[in-house]
């Protein structure tokens, strides 16, 4: 089959230099170039398929590329298409090593057992963070004393040592061990190295910008007299937390002798104005190759920037656009910086019956340990005899209830209030019995408060914020990040009146997320990291605010990676791009992201008041009768009584018949 190539692609496919870096703009056809390069090597240069390896970063990408190569060029036999780890596994098997890869569940249990010594509850996020730090350390080529983990150094070292001890004792490997062993083997045994140098004459690497130090070391070892054909884009390097570095793209010609850079400049994916706007953003980065990027399409799509009052109105606007659109649900993607931001979108889509697909299928905001803790307090308020939730909260903050006493409560046979179990225990000191009784009364008191007041009472009066301070210090974690979870939880409860309503809402969200796992035709919800390499007709990039994107933890030394992340997000769009920057997030006023300003995105002002005035009485379909407190451009503030004040997009309410004036 004849494949049509543009001039940039032809130069990349047919060049005969030894070491080539193809710098590929988004949507520029890098997979087309790679499979055509392989075909050129086989048909024109008569290279044996056994002398070619094509390395990708995921098995799915490798399978897709192999399949396309075979189908496009009608081949029965293909060279190796696979990941670095897949290649290293094959090498070690060939050299006689017996390899058993450690199961993910076992890794989790090892780390959890270490972390459990420092905290009663160990979150999945914390386990993943430790395992990621272990991987980052092993691939960094640094000594242990030189490595700075993102958590407590003592906890990291203990976790690392226990993890390695278990693997060594049971003859197990992880993927990083495969990399380390192959490189060590090649360094120590020149005969084996030369064997593979003679075998791997042509090495092709996809997503070169994602290579870590160990992978670059391997490629350099394979490059003695062989050819390297690397394809990537430093502007899409968004995995520094895994050890990838854009510098390898920029300094390619210094690392690999005689290296030459070729640029794929035509974006075949996006409408012209989306390409032009994305260029305005990414040109502000310094760690990049200067390059020409241009759109193949001469058409302009819709680029809309909106600055709604808050995240709820943001969700309403997105819902209205999708509902009125002729596009299929699956052609829309809502993208965000962190998983937590999906919470408000899920709420809105659930209420408006818009089907969705969570790419991170296991994510539920209410599964975060902070949410579980606050919910445990509230459940205990509903049922003071609830032993499970009593055990969950009693030492958050630490209330000097020993592990033996916790076990005593857990195994107590009679159906008795857990507070009374400890208070009536003979060896419980009077002062502790008094404290337990006071805590019981405080928890029962939660039932008399409004939901928002009850949540705040748990955080402030019952000392949960003190527990979070201790947690942050112990695990070397940002207290601000933990407080963001608390504020998001408060936002989730906004509009609900009672503890029972909140508990029902949490169960409803859980059910909806479970249902979404079976949904085939739904709007895609994902972090920007999760959609790299994908494309959608319509992209909705939400919460484009300072301290969200760029994230507040990356405002200084990692600002270029944050800009790359924003760039990756907006370049997923084929037809239309919608960017939202709420004026408030979790009740706090926010500045519009600098990346929005760099891209020249501008909001269209909405000044229509639809004849509604302050103090008018209206009826909202969801909240009932209310009074207009204030109208400011498109934001209408309504008072529904009982202390419930809400802000909405006036245009959304009117256009969707959600609000009517009560005559």
Regions found by a protein language model. Name each.
Residues 32-47, 220:
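Walker A/P-loop NTP-binding motif
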Residues 377-589, 593-598:
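Conserved helicase C-terminal RecA-like lobe
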Residues 20-21, 52, 262, 332:
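Conserved beta-strand position immediately N-terminal to the Walker
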Residues 2-14, 18-22, 61, 80, ...:
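Conserved helicase NTPase motor core
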Residues 76-91, 354-376:
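Conserved beta-strand -> loop -> alpha-helix junction used to position metal-binding or nucleic-acid-contacting
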Residues 544-644, 648-650, 655-663:
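C-terminal accessory regions
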Residues 26-34, 257-260, 265-356, 382-383, ...:
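Helicase P-loop NTPase motor core
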Residues 18-19, 25-28, 41-186, 190, ...:
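A basic/glycine-biased coupling hinge at the interface between accessory DNA-binding modules
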